[in-house]
Amino acid sequence: MKLLLKSVIFIFLTISVIGCLEKKPSKTVTENGVINVITPSDFKTNSVGQVIIDVRTPEEFANGHIEGAININLFDKNFESKLLKLDKSKPVFIYCRSGRRTATASKKASKLGFENVNDLQGGLQKWVKNNYKITK
């Protein structure tokens, strides 16, 4: 009986934690501007003609990325200096594989003075799940 109760509690906690990991669409007002977590549909529509930044490694980027994206690896020691070469007053659209690195990159961009940062909810995984194309 104890084993069954422990198993049920473990399953419930696992499902709860997994459900909380994916970021939901949201808007965070920062000192310098706003960070928007947006759906793949909104990202696709609103990023046309804008700066799209893929923060994954160059190897991940080479395996497929959103068309028109530039690769600025979050783990690169020059990540912030590369970001600063972009116009901070224009919207930027940032993504990674699942959304975790994007959250970090979005906060860094905002601290650097970017006024309108858009974070792809669920990253490239969710982009592909929505049947949107990637390019190599």
Question: What is each residue range found by the language model?
Answer:
Residues 2-8, 18-41, 46-50, 58-90, ...:
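Rhodanese-like catalytic fold shared by cysteine-dependent sulfurtransferases
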